[in-house]
């Protein structure tokens, strides 16, 4: 499943030893295991190899961080020109900083990671600029603010991007 303003590039037919795709943006993948033809998601400076699994990759070009979150199964995340790799366990998230090339592991709230699939946007301790960037991906609006004091604060909120069943009656 692709998130808004995301692009997935893939061949008409997979040939060769791998099933490789290129992601710009965010997507969730459910992949059947095939040891002879691993499924690889390439995004910017890293790639995620599925080992029979469900996982989420967030790799928007304008973000300073890339994130791979494992929902079930296992994945191998390779980075730093494929010289380093980490195998994730379920509910782990690898966060890779594109500028410093550093990485760390987190245990995120999985419901927050997959919220976009339910028509929700979850922001936890985020800067206003990052929240507006996410909103601009989802909606055809530009968000502007002029109070520089707001720039230093972080904010948390939950927004519904599609009407609830209750609202459509």
Language-model features and meaning:
Residues 1-162, 166:
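A residue-level detector for the "anchor" residue at the start of short, highly conserved motifs
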């Amino acid at each position: 499943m692709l998130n808004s303003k995301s692009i997935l590039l893939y061949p008409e037919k997979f040939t060769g030893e791998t099933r490789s795709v290129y992601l710009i943006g965010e997507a969730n993948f459910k992949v059947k295991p095939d040891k002879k033809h691993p499924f690889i998601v390439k995004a910017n400076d890293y790639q995620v190899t599925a080992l029979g699994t469900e996982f989420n990759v967030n790799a928007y070009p304008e973000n300073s961080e890339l994130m791979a979150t494992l929902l079930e199964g296992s994945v191998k995340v390779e980075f730093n020109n494929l010289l380093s790799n980490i195998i994730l366990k379920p509910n782990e998230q690898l966060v890779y900083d594109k500028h410093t090339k550093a990485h760390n592991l987190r245990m995120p709230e999985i419901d927050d990671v997959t919220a976009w699939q339910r028509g929700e946007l979850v922001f936890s301790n985020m800067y206003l600029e990052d929240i507006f960037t996410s909103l601009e991906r989802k909606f055809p609006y530009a968000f502007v603010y002029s109070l520089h004091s707001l720039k230093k604060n972080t904010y948390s909120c939950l927004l519904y991007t599609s009407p609830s069943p209750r609202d459509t009656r």
